């Protein structure tokens, strides 16, 4: 039985990135009717930033951790269980100031953990999330695709691909709805604007 982890990071319920993850999940469930979907909306309970206790706990063998250290890692452990359980990830992300939303960065800091999502072998890091698939479902107000003048300002999917690759995820797809600032124009039909992107989402999820 396949399992999909859906991550949402936009604070807006009507955001384009959520429309993309909605469409991905619907198409994925149609293709995998017996599959399980784990939903993690990071905006409902934003992860806290890591602190000295958290860092110390990560580098302390589990049997030697204090109650405070175990408590500090509890949320991270829950995130990691979802990552390890899932076969595929659907990551909904809107571009914020040329990169990812702060809440998604907080989640990343909680899940990049030595001994859980990566380890060192012969002095080199090795990702432990092998055999997983990820789809980055991005929404950007401007257009930052390859060959455009603003291409070099896109730190969203290059960063996420770097993080996922570091953790061992090699099968990564990116579907981007670019130029979404046009939707602020009342003369632009949202459904017609998004349909070509949603079609790519459906094809990717199937």
Curated annotation (Swiss-Prot):
SUPFAM superfamilies: Flavoproteins. The keyword Cell inner membrane does not apply. Its EC number is 1.6.5.-, 1.7.1.17. It comes from the Bacteria. It is an enzyme of class 1 (oxidoreductase). Its cofactor is FMN. Gene3D superfamilies: 3.40.50.360. It holds the Pfam family Flavodoxin_2. Binds 1 FMN per subunit. Keywords: Flavoprotein, FMN, NAD, Oxidoreductase. It catalyses: 2 a quinone + NADH + H(+) = 2 a 1,4-benzosemiquinone + NAD(+); N,N-dimethyl-1,4-phenylenediamine + anthranilate + 2 NAD(+) = 2-(4-dimethylaminophenyl)diazenylbenzoate + 2 NADH + 2 H(+). One of its GO terms (molecular function) is oxidoreductase activity, acting on NAD(P)H as acceptor. FMN binds at residues 10, 15-17. Belongs to the azoreductase type 1 family. Homodimer. Quinone reductase that provides resistance to thiol-specific stress caused by electrophilic quinones. Also exhibits azoreductase activity. Catalyzes the reductive cleavage of the azo bond in aromatic azo compounds to the corresponding amines. This is FMN-dependent NADH:quinone oxidoreductase. It comes from Acidobacterium capsulatum (strain ATCC 51196 / DSM 11244 / BCRC 80197 / JCM 7670 / NBRC 15755 / NCIMB 13165 / 161). The gene is azoR.
